[in-house]
Structure formats: C-alpha cells, structure tokens
C-alpha cells in the first residue's frame, strides 16, 4: 500500500517540478520577447502596412495601394540615385574591408614585437567616436588646407587646380566615404579574422612546408579554405551594414554634393523627418531596402552552401 502511494505521488512531483522549471525559463525569456514584439515586430508590421498608405503624421492615414512603389521606380530620380549609390558603396566597401582586415590579421597573427600594441592601434578607429574621427578625416582631406592635398601638391607636383576635392567633389565624394568606412571598420573585422586564424590547424601548414610549399601557397591553399566560415560571416555583416549605411554620409558629406552620396537610409531619413513628413513613402523605401538585403543574403547563403 505504501509503495503504491509513493508511486502515485511521484508523477505529480515530477509534473510540478517540470511546470516550475518551464515557468522559470519563460520568466527569463519574457522580457526579451516582449521587447522584441513591442520595439521590433509591431513597428515592422506597421511599416509594411504604412508602405501602401499616405500619411504625414497629422492627417488621417489614406490607403493608396501601390502608388508609392510606382513612384519610386518611375519618377523619383533621387531614390534611383540613392539606390545606385548604395550598391556602389557596398561593392566598394565589402571587398576592400575584407582584404585589409584579413591582411592585418595575418600580419598581426605572427610572433612580432609590439604585436598587442599594433592590434590595439588597428582596433582603435572602430571604438573611437564617429563624430571625432569624421572631424579629423574632414580636416585631413580638406581640399584647400588638408595635408593630403598639400603632399600631392608639394611632393608629387599636382597643380592646385587639379587637386581632388575629396568629400566636396561630386566625382570623389563616394570614394572618400568608402575609404573612411574601410579605415573605420577594418579593425573590428581584423579581430574576427584573428579569432578564425587561431582555429586553423598548424599541422597542415607544417606538412605542406615539408612538401615544399612556400608561404603564399600555404596561405592560399590551406589557411584561406579554413577561414571560409569566418569570411562568410564577415561578408554577410559587411553587406548588411553597407546597405544600412547612414552615419558616415551624415557626418562627412550630408548626402552631397547634390545626390553623389545619397544612400537609401539617408533618403529614408530625409523623406520621413525633413521638411514635410511622408511616412508612407519612407516606409515604401524601407520595404525596398528590406527586400534587397534579403535577396542578397539569400544568394550569399546559397553560394556558401555550394562552396561547402
């Protein structure tokens, strides 16, 4: 009788403990989940719905169907310029940042003197205030008094009228922003590559060296293939951040001169918050940006599976 009573009580105790553990787990998850719903999911759904409407924040929301999207791809020249500039920025920053960060990681992965010091120096631009480094960058690349143009003029004989105008020039503004972004971010991705290099198998390099492979052959055929997961992560992160670029444009060029450095996110900001607000139209641009990033990411994932 006693053993039967114990057996009947045991499942209840297990059930109560399981329920209590589940409640504890949900209590930890709930704050983050609620925050995600309130600050991410609900605004995203509202933005999708708003993309098919006209709304200035003061009058009633008016449903207009696909008119916002039709206007984007037919008559809005600024949007088309912003889309082109965003793609150019991504194409310029992703391979340059990738190559520079990988090169620095390989160099600073060696047993050299002051290695930790140089790692810190390389990482510093990433953690430095964007406002401060942008001000310094504008001073260095000042068309009139910047040291870069002074060096070009005095040591390389470039005439004053032929000196590049950098951020102030329509043809050089995007190049200036791309160079700034590469310099600002390559330290962060260098650290990621350093972590990837620490996971590479040194025995493979030693075996290849015994077979007569030089340093370049070892890097290209042994080290680089082992870094494929790291490289894939870096490319994804650089691509997404490239499509979302805003801060650099705002601090260095303000989207100019003209629309030379106007990007999609900067244009979204202007449409939504500058002059007369057009929240529906800005939401439509956001949806185009979302779909563009999603398509590029899917293509990259499929390409990565093919490589594997």
Give the residues covered by each predicted segment:
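Short, Lys/Arg-rich, polar N-terminal cytosolic tail immediately upstream
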Residues: 1-19
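A structural signal for multi-pass alpha-helical bundles of membrane permease subunits
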Residues: 18-308
């Amino acid at each position: 009788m006693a053993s039967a009573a114990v057996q009947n009580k045991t499942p209840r105790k297990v059930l109560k403990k399981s329920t209590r553990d589940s409640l504890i787990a949900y209590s930890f998850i709930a704050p983050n989940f609620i925050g995600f719903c309130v600050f991410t999911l609900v605004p995203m759904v509202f933005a999708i719905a708003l993309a098919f409407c006209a709304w200035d924040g003061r009058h009633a929301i008016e449903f207009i169907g696909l008119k916002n999207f039709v206007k984007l791809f037919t008559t809005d020249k600024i949007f088309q310029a912003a889309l082109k500039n965003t793609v150019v920025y991504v194409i310029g920053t992703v391979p340059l940042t990738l190559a520079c960060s990988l090169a620095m990681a390989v160099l600073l992965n060696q047993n050299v003197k002051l290695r930790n010091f140089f790692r810190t120096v390389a990482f510093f631009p990433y953690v430095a205030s964007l406002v401060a480094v942008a001000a310094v960058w504008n001073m260095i690349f000042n068309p009139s008094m910047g040291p870069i143009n002074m060096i070009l003029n005095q040591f390389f004989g470039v005439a004053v009228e032929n000196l590049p105008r950098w951020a102030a020039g329509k043809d050089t503004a995007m190049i200036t922003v791309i160079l700034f972004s590469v310099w600002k971010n390559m330290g962060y991705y260098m650290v990621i590559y350093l972590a990837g290099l620490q996971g590479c198998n040194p025995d493979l390099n030693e075996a290849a060296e015994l077979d007569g492979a030089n340093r370049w052959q070892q890097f290209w055929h042994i080290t680089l293939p082992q870094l494929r997961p790291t490289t894939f992560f870096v490319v994804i992160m650089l691509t997404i951040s490239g499509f979302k670029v805003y801060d650099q444009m705002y601090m260095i060029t303000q989207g100019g001169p003209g629309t030379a450095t106007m990007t999609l996110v900067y244009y979204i900001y202007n449409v939504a918050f500058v002059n007369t607000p057009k929240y529906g139209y800005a939401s439509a641009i956001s949806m185009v940006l979302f779909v563009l990033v999603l398509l590029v990411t899917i293509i990259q994932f499929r390409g990565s599976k093919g490589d594997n």
